[in-house]
Swiss-Prot record:
Domain of life the protein comes from: Eukaryota
Name of the featured protein: HLA class I histocompatibility antigen protein P5
Tissue: Expressed in lymphoid tissues; Detected in spleen as well as in B-cell lines, NK cell lines and activated lymphocytes.
Effect of V112G: Associated with low viral load in HIV patients
Length: 132
C-alpha cells in the first residue's frame, strides 16, 4: 500500500511524506486506526478507513503483522530518526490508549483506503492509498 500523508512537527504542518505499507497478509473487516507515531521530533496520528465501518468503530480486527517502510524522502536532518529500514509491529483494534506508543495497524480487504492525517486531535488532510 502506498500512502501519502502529512507530517506534523511542533504544531506546524510540514511537507508531504510518502510511506509504503507492505503487509504480510490482509485479514478482517471494518476500520482500523493507529496510535500516534513518534519518531525523533515527529508526532503523527494516522487513521485509515478501509471501505467498511467508521474509524474507531466497534468492529475488532485480528492481529496483522506488517512492515511500515520509512522512505528516504525525509530531509537528511531527520534521516537517522526515521531510519532507512522498516518497523515491524502488530496492533489490535480497539481503544488506542491501551496499545503501545509506536504505531501498528489493522488492515481489511479493501483495494482503496481513505487516509486521514491528524495530530493532537486536529484533522489535517485526506489522501488516498491503494494496495500495491
Amino acid at each position: 500500500m502506498l500512502l501519502r500523508m502529512s507530517e506534523h512537527r511542533n504544531e506546524a504542518l510540514g511537507n508531504y511524506l510518502e510511506m509504503r505499507l507492505k503487509s504480510s497478509f490482509l485479514r478482517g473487516l471494518g476500520s482500523w486506526k493507529s496510535n500516534p507515531l513518534r519518531l525523533g521530533g515527529w508526532t503523527i496520528l494516522l487513521t485509515l478507513t478501509m471501505g467498511q465501518g467508521e474509524p474507531g468503530g466497534p468492529q475488532g480486527d485480528p492481529w496483522v503483522p506488517h512492515e511500515l517502510l520509512l522512505p528516504s524522502l525525509c530531509d537528511s536532518s531527520h534521516a537517522s530518526s526515521w531510519g532507512s529500514g522498516s518497523i515491524t509491529c502488530a496492533w489490535r483494534g480497539g481503544d488506542s490508549s491501551s496499545h503501545p506508543l509506536v504505531s501498528g495497524h489493522i488492515l481489511s480487504n479493501s483495494p482503496v483506503a481513505a487516509v486521514m492525517c491528524s495530530s493532537m486531535g486536529t484533522h489535517l488532510s485526506p489522501f488516498k492509498g491503494t494496495l500495491l
